[in-house]
C-alpha cells in the first residue's frame, strides 16, 4: 500500500490518494474540491482509480465528490448514513461560503465494522462520531495506517461545535476505538501533518493520557 496527500479547497483539506502496489488500483479519500489539481495528481501517479471514499459529509471533504464520481464513472463509498444531514446541505453550504459544493448520494453507506477494498487492499471501517455524526475512519491493519478525517490532528482534535457535534462522543471514539489500534499507527488527518497515535497519546493537549487522567 502507498499513499499521497493533495491539499484541496481554501481550507487545505488533505485529500488522500491511496493505492495497492500489487494491482496499481487506487482510491481518492475526501476529494472535496480542486478537481483539476486532483486529476493531475492521479495522472502523474499512474494509479488507476477504482472508487471514492468519504470520511464525513462536510463540504471541504466531499463538496465535489459527486461531480468527480460522475465525470470519472466511480462509485462513492461512505460515510455512515447519519451524515446524510450534512450531505443534504452541500448546495446550501457551498453557496454560503463561496465554494463549489453539490449534493450527492453515496453508492454505499458504511457502518462500523464494514470493510472496503482498494485493489487487493482491505480497509477496516471505524465509525467515530463527535465531529460529525456519520464520520468514519479507514484503517489498513497490515500497514498500521489510518485516514482519520477530522477526528484527530497532530496536537488537536476535531471541532464539536457544529450541528450534531458532540465532544464526549469524539473523545470516546478516539480513546476507545483508535488508541487500541496501537501507538505505532501512522495517520493522515483531514488537515495538517501526519502523526502517530502514540505521539498524540503523549503530547496532544486534548486526548493525551496525561490530559485525560
For every predicted segment, state its role:
Residues 28-29, 50-57, 77-80, 127-130, ...:
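Active-site neighborhood of phospho(di)ester-bond hydrolases with catalytic His/Asp-centered motifs
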Residues 22-23, 33, 59, 83, ...:
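Short, glycine/acidic-enriched loop or turn micro-motifs at the edges of active sites
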Residues 6, 18, 112-118:
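Short acidic-hydrophobic surface loop/beta-edge motif
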Residues 2-4, 48, 75, 108, ...:
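Conserved beta-strand segments of alpha/beta enzyme cores
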Residues 91-93, 115, 121-213:
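Metallo-beta-lactamase
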Residues 33-117, 202-210:
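Active-site HxH/HxHxD metal-binding segment of metal-dependent hydrolases
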Residues 1-45, 137-149:
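Conserved beta-strand hairpin/beta-sheet module of binuclear metal-dependent hydrolase folds
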Residues 6-8, 99, 105-107, 127-129:
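Short Gly/Pro-enriched turn/cap motifs at secondary-structure boundaries
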Amino acid at each position: 500500500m502507498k499513499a499521497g496527500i493533495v491539499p484541496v479547497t481554501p481550507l487545505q483539506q488533505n485529500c488522500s490518494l491511496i493505492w495497492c502496489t500489487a494491482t496499481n488500483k487506487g482510491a481518492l479519500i475526501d476529494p472535496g474540491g480542486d478537481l483539476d489539481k486532483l486529476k493531475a495528481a492521479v495522472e502523474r501517479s499512474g494509479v488507476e482509480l477504482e472508487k471514492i471514499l468519504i470520511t464525513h459529509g462536510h463540504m471541504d471533504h466531499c463538496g465535489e465528490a459527486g461531480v468527480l464520481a460522475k465525470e470519472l464513472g466511480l462509485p462513492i463509498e461512505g460515510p455512515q448514513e447519519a451524515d446524510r444531514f450534512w450531505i443534504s446541505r452541500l448546495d446550501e453550504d457551498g453557496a454560503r461560503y463561496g465554494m463549489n459544493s453539490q449534493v450527492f448520494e453515496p453508492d454505499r453507506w458504511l457502518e462500523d465494522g464494514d470493510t472496503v477494498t482498494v485493489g487487493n487492499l482491505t480497509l477496516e471501517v471505524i465509525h467515530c462520531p463527535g465531529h460529525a455524526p456519520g464520520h468514519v475512519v479507514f484503517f489498513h491493519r497490515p500497514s498500521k495506517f489510518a485516514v482519520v478525517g477530522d477526528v484527530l490532528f497532530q496536537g488537536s482534535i476535531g471541532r464539536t461545535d457544529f450541528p450534531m457535534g458532540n465532544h464526549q462522543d469524539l473523545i470516546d471514539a478516539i480513546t476507545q476505538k483508535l488508541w487500541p489500534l496501537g501507538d505505532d499507527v501512522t495517520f493522515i488527518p483531514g488537515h495538517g501533518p501526519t502523526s502517530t497515535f502514540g505521539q498524540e497519546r503523549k503530547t496532544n493537549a486534548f486526548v493525551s493520557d496525561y490530559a485525560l487522567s
